[in-house]
Regions:
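Glycine-rich flavin
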Residues: 2-6, 22-29, 34-189, 222-226, ...
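Short FAD-binding loop at a beta-strand-to-alpha-helix junction that anchors the flavin cofactor
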Residues: 324-354, 452
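A conserved FAD-binding loop/helix module that cradles the flavin
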Residues: 229-230, 341, 347-409, 492-513
Length: 513
């Protein structure tokens, strides 16, 4: 019997994969999507969406803890942790079914098997196998069984995402040494939790567990929380988290994790001037669990036959995409997202930072539209993505929303404040809506270029920051100036007024501060 043949096969059913599959189907290709777990990928099932459900619960707990200040009395506040976790799992399940429906609607064949590419183009061969997948564990270990069938295609898009990194001396064990999946699915809340890494994952889970009564310690090797953000944001966030009762250890390295006893013992030491932990000052921290949130690498192990010679770079699949550097300004350019193998493309987390779901989805669309245009199936060449106009969001409280360059990145490029750029900052404590809603932590910071006033970067710390950043993302995409932000009437009273005031501040004419 002849193998099934498709025009396009997408491997990976996350926000990059399923969006790319839909766009290919819209353009007239015969499409299949291979996902060995559940449709929606990590984002929908184990990341972005269920974590926001947990954060919504934590926000409610935070409000209830402040009930006296709101003039409300409810009596003793109790919670059922299993139901809290269960609600987040229900949210994920509902959306998972929604993505499966989208595949049927767009006549995309969903193949729920493990894929291995054994032959590159022009006629790509993909072996399909059953597998035993422990989806609830980090890093989702899998046992692959014998080949069930083989399919062929003209093009394949790899959208397999990323896998969490561990430490040489601390491997995920599904019990005491956690990744995000264990933190999201654990029905026995720990009394003490140590989090290694102060990026989005560490900050968000820290916020959740702290508001449900867990004693949380966050360890970060650099000098501030959310270290990829603007330095001013990170330092202010560090102060705020300390104020709210988190145990914060910045400029601290982890030397060892001992999980042999009842709980975990984490040996740490302050970072020395040589960039290494000073072992003469080490101390041991104890907790019930430790969550490793130290970054990710591309997930492609076992996906390609070794004989194909797939090129990789720094733990990711190599394409014509090159991640941004703080020291190198970037101009948007057309990308094909092609690998070194004929007919094989790759998008999303598997090709490198910034490891964001919305970037993966956009890359998938651009990848498909680019080859479709070359084949006469799309009416125009797609507008390339500007990787300096990507909003980044962290959903702890206060939230962080950012787009464009940080001030430290501009300094690394040799730009000088007052000569090449200027900065405007407006604190939420001076904003009527923030005072009325008890959300006075944080600020809006706008960096404008000189002499024209174009938006180089915007960094928001505070309530609704992840929503407010959309305005400034569009402003940067359209090459708007602070003068145009100022000339745009912002409704009163809103948190958006802080954006308007920060634009005014960047020109030295702030009104309400």
């Amino acid at each position: 019997m002849a193998n099934k043949h498709f025009d396009v096969v997408v491997v990976g059913g996350g926000p990059g994969g399923y969006v790319g599959a839909i766009r290919a189907a819209q353009l007239g290709y015969k499409v299949a999507i291979i996902e060995r777990a559940k449709m929606g990928g990590v984002c929908l099932n184990w990341g972005c969406i269920p974590s926001k459900a947990l954060i919504a619960n934590a926000e409610l707990m935070e409000k209830l803890a402040e009930q006296e200040e709101w003039g409300i009395t409810t009596g003793e506040v109790k919670f059922n942790w299993k139901k809290v976790i269960g609600r987040s799992r229900d949210v994920a399940a509902k959306l998972n079914k929604g993505v499966e429906y989208l595949m049927k609607k767009n006549k995309i064949e969903f193949i729920n098997l493990h894929a291995k590419i054994v032959k590159a183009g022009p006629k790509i061969e993909i072996e399909l196998r059953d597998c035993d997948l422990q989806e609830e564990l980090t890093p989702s270990p899998v046992k692959v069984n014998k080949v069930k069938e083989t399919i062929t295609c003209g093009k394949v898009i790899i959208a397999t995402g990323a896998v969490a990194r561990d430490l040489p001396f601390a491997k995920f064990d599904g019990d005491k040494i956690w990744g995000a999946r264990e933190a999201m699915n654990n029905t026995d809340r720990p009394e003490k939790l140590i989090i290694v890494g102060a990026g989005a994952i560490g900050m968000e889970f820290g916020y959740v567990y702290k508001n449900f009564g867990t004693e949380v310690t966050i360890i970060e090797m650099l000098d501030r929380l959310v270290p990829v953000e603007d330095e001013q944001v990170g330092k202010e966030m560090t102060k705020i988290y300390k104020k709210h009762g988190f145990n914060i250890k910045v400029k601290t390295g982890v030397l060892d994790v001992d999980s042999s006893g009842k709980g975990v013992k984490v040996t740490v030491a302050p970072m020395g001037k040589d960039g290494k932990p000073d072992t003469s000052k080490k101390e041991v921290l104890e907790a019930d669990k430790v969550l490793l949130a130290i970054g990710v690498g591309g997930r492609y192990d076992g996906l390609f036959d070794d004989s194909l010679g797939l090129e990789t770079v720094r733990g990711h699949i190599k394409t014509d995409y090159v991640p941004l550097s703080d020291t190198t300004p970037s101009e948007p350019k057309p990308l094909d997202y092609k690998t070194n193998l004929p007919g094989v493309y790759a998008i999303g987390d598997v090709i490198g930072p910034p490891w964001l779901a919305h970037v993966a989805a956009e890359e998938a669309v651009l990848c498909v539209e680019r080859f479709a245009f070359k084949e006469g199936k799309a009416k125009h060449d797609p507008i390339p993505m500007d990787y300096t106009v990507i909003p980044g969001c962290t959903y702890c409280h206060p939230q962080v929303g950012s787009v464009g360059y940080t001030e430290q990145a501009l300094k690394a490029q040799g730009l000088k404040k007052g000569e090449d750029y200027d900065v405007g900052v407006f604190n939420n404590g001076a904003l009527g809506k923030a005072i009325a809603t008890r959300h006075t932590d944080g600020f809006v910071k706008i960096i404008r270029g000189l002499p024209r006033g174009e938006i180089l970067g915007t960094h928001i710390l505070g309530d609704q920051a992840t929503e407010l950043i959309a305005e400034m993302t569009l402003a940067r995409r359209l090459e708007a100036t602070t003068e145009e932000i100022i000339a745009t009437v912002h409704a009163h009273p809103t948190m958006h007024e802080a954006v308007h005031e920060a634009a005014l501040a960047s020109e030295g004419r702030v009104i309400n501060s």
